[in-house]
């Protein structure tokens, strides 16, 4: 589970340089796995300010997970057939959304690896 603070610009899906460095380390440690990887994007419940790119938190969470998956494919050598993405928007919170701290916990990327 990777917190999104510093991972993406607010309301965006481009990977920030610091997050790319972290993903590089994660990718290196996971590269020996022969299993499948699922990258899940999650958001808080604050509606996306429509900027022409993302219509909703569904769009945003899906694109963020796709950005992370694409990084693993391009930079860490994962095969496309072994990587899937999912965007869950605010449907799977791990904290309450009634505080800034809770919302920050809910904005995250989760990487699930099936080591089979």
Give residue ranges: language-model regions.
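Periplasmic OmpA-like peptidoglycan-binding domain that tethers envelope proteins to the cell wall
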Residues: 1, 7-22, 29-32, 42-116
């Amino acid at each position: 589970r990777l917190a999104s603070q510093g991972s993406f610009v607010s309301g965006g899906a481009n990977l920030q340089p610091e997050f790319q460095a972290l993903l590089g380390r994660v990718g290196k440690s996971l590269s020996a796995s022969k299993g499948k990887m699922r990258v899940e994007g999650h958001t808080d419940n604050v509606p996306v300010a429509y900027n022409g790119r993302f219509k909703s938190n569904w769009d945003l969470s899906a694109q963020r997970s796709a950005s992370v998956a694409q990084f693993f494919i391009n930079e860490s050598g994962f095969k496309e057939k072994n990587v899937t993405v999912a965007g869950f928007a605010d449907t799977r919170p791990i904290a309450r959304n009634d505080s800034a701290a809770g919302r920050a916990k809910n904005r995250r990327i989760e990487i699930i690896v099936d080591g089979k």
